[in-house]
Curated annotation (Swiss-Prot):
GO MF annotation, one: translation elongation factor activity
Known role: GTP hydrolase that promotes the GTP-dependent binding of aminoacyl-tRNA to the A-site of ribosomes during protein biosynthesis.
Keywords noted in UniProt: Cytoplasm, Elongation factor, GTP-binding, Hydrolase, Magnesium, Metal-binding, Nucleotide-binding, Protein biosynthesis
Pfam families: GTP_EFTU, GTP_EFTU_D2, GTP_EFTU_D3
Catalyses which reaction(s): GTP + H2O = GDP + phosphate + H(+)
Location of the region described as G5 in the Swiss-Prot/TrEMBL record: 169-171
Family note: Belongs to the TRAFAC class translation factor GTPase superfamily. Classic translation factor GTPase family. EF-Tu/EF-1A subfamily.
Entry annotated with the keyword Ribosomal protein: no
Subunit structure: Monomer.
Chief site of localization: cytoplasm
Signal peptide, first to last residue: none
This protein's name: Elongation factor Tu
Length: 391
């Protein structure tokens, strides 16, 4: 049977459920599919397949559903470690998150950790589902839990006072036992997600950026740089900058080709060769980027949120300490960097996630939210994301 065509007539948004173990993330995911998609039972979602992202194995379940306003792709992870890995590697991009918190327990350690991770990896918006409200008889207690969640969100720089909090029971929705806290709450939740989580800007509408993968010299024509356009559009005749590794320089794109055909422009997702004016074959190298002038700056020092692989995942067998010097693989190239651990952290064990400061030996074109792999001699030992730029 032919797959049904993916209708592109609605904006597409990627979201996911986050929160403490056993607070009902997977049950809620199942309940949403019941009313807005093709129903997936708890067991189907819980048996999440393994996938690889940046050399790291992660279990993630993907479901899709739609509201009258939008089409959603939704991720749910079976284990806490999968959440950490998922959010840091960006295996499943999140434009927003549904924080699930049990009304019976209130915020727990992983509730806090997932909110911190969401802040560090730049999840733009969170909506809260206060689950299991049927287990709380006292209305004042319910209010107290809501207040606690709002304060926790505010403490991590999310707008805790404005974030929608919907109270309900995923189980009631799945069992059709109480319409008010079941179906009605799920519908109210999705209305809040529609309204509160902003539609992401499409890559094509962002400023042009192409990581350089290769450089060729074509006799009689000049220098061609190749790569996959990450975002935006480049038109023949436009001025671009070459950023990273060496001092930033300007050039003009005098030709764009794809599959040996000449084009008048290249856009996000295209694998292109760009002919650049006045650049010698050795004036540009893999690991630099072509970009819209002034849109990206080179940096050496940044704060990163990183996950360090366990021995079982093919990572290090031993901890590392301050002054650890691995390679950081950004886009197309490895750059050596020096790691400084935060005060009070003696060492980092395989399997940890940690905030560290990194100083690269050469500057790389970077912005917040840029992801990287941590490698030792070509072997991946961790993954990370630029949380903030220091200099």
């Amino acid at each position: 049977m032919a797959k049904s065509k993916f209708e592109r007539n609605k904006p597409h948004v990627n979201i996911g459920t986050i929160g403490h173990v056993d607070h009902g993330k997977t049950s809620l995911t199942a309940a949403i599919t019941k009313y807005f998609g093709e129903f997936k039972a708890y067991d189907q979602i819980d048996a999440a397949p393994e996938e690889k992202a940046r050399g790291i194995t992660i279990s993630t379940a993907h479901v899709e559903y739609e509201t009258p306003a939008r089409h959603y792709a939704h991720v749910d992870c079976p284990g806490h470690a999968d959440y950490v890995k998922n959010m840091i590697t960006g295996a499943a991009q999140m434009d927003g998150a549904i924080l699930v918190c049990s009304a019976a327990d209130g915020p727990m350690p992983q509730t806090r950790e997932h909110i911190l991770l969401a802040r560090q990896v730049g999840v733009p918006a969170i909506v809260v589902f206060l689950n299991k409200v049927d287990q709380v008889d006292d209305a004042e207690l319910l209010e107290l839990v809501e207040l606690e969640v709002r304060e926790l969100l505010s403490s991590y720089d999310f707008p805790g006072d404005d974030i929608p909090i919907i109270k309900g029971s995923a189980l009631a929705a799945l069992e059709d036992s109480d319409k008010k806290i079941g179906e009605d709450a799920i519908r109210e939740l999705m209305a809040a997600v529609d309204a509160y989580i902003p539609t992401p800007e499409r890559p094509i509408d962002q400023p042009f950026l192409m990581p350089i993968e290769d450089v060729f010299s074509i006799s009689g024509r000049g220098t061609v740089v190749t790569g996959r356009v990450e975002r935006g559009i480049v038109k023949v005749g436009e001025e671009v900058e070459i950023v990273g590794i060496r001092p930033t320089s300007k050039t003009t794109v005098t030709g764009v080709e794809m599959f040996r055909k000449l084009l008048d422009q290249g856009q996000a997702g295209d694998n292109i060769g760009a002919l650049v004016r006045g650049v010698t074959r050795d004036g540009v190298e893999r690991g630099q980027i072509l970009c819209k002038p002034g849109s990206v700056k080179p940096h050496k020092k940044f704060m990163a949120e990183a996950y360090i692989l366990t021995k079982e995942e093919g990572g290090r067998h031993t901890p590392f300490f301050t002054n650890y010097r691995p390679q950081f693989y950004f886009r197309t190239t490895d750059v050596t960097g020096i790691v400084s651990l935060p005060e009070g952290t003696e060492m980092v064990m395989p399997g940890d996630n940690v905030t560290v400061e990194v100083e690269l030996i050469v500057p790389i074109a970077m912005e917040e939210k840029l992801r990287f792999a941590i490698r030792e001699g070509g072997r991946t030992v961790g993954a990370g994301i630029v949380a903030s730029i220091v200099e």
